[in-house]
Amino acid sequence: MNTLGIDPKGTLMVHLSCKAIGEVEGHGETLLDLLAEYMEPGLLVLPSHTWHSVGTENPVMDVLYTPACTGALTEVFRRRPGVWRSLHPTHSLAALGRDAREFLAGEEHISTPCGKGGAYYKLWERDAQILLLGVNFTRNTFIHGIEDWDGALGSVSEEKTDLYVINYQGNRVYTPQHRHCSRVGSDTFSKLEPDALQQGILTLGRFGDATTRLMWARPLREMVAAILKRDPGYLLRY
């Protein structure tokens, strides 16, 4: 991890594919152990989204029991001792480390998938590092946040969907949401990678058989926001 340029005392947001890494003794648990040990002085964050199962027909997300739709390893991570999960109904995050509860606090009051004041916004505020481990830019949910904060066209719906979260105390919390509505989703995010490389925002590396993509949140937002200012519909086109 050190050779990749990751700051162990900072905040690290990880999107990963265990399959892409190749053979790992102990499978995914070993990888989670490695990440947790390396980031022990800081904060380790993984996605724990539930947008695939929570919606109009099933409007309730239970922070303890609703499974993540972001891969088997993220589900294993959120169940680990010491890991906390945020109370966002569709785009929750799981965090382990220094100030996990503070970082995740208040997500039940955020009305968009990655809205201002929420955990994804805090990644920008603290200039977190984002590691794409064996996955590409289409898995970089932070960019959805930039769309929301910086005026991308067609990012979220005008109307709200009535959703609820059951918190750690078993209480049901009403948290209506403007949901993602882009017809292309995150499929166009890969268009941003060449610019990020050219501007020195993105660093490529290797971990096992997987390509790693490492970047800092603030310069990434600055780059994408500048593109959206010139062309608010840029990420709606392939």
How should each PLM-predicted stretch be described?
Residues 1-238:
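N-terminal and secondary-structure boundary signal
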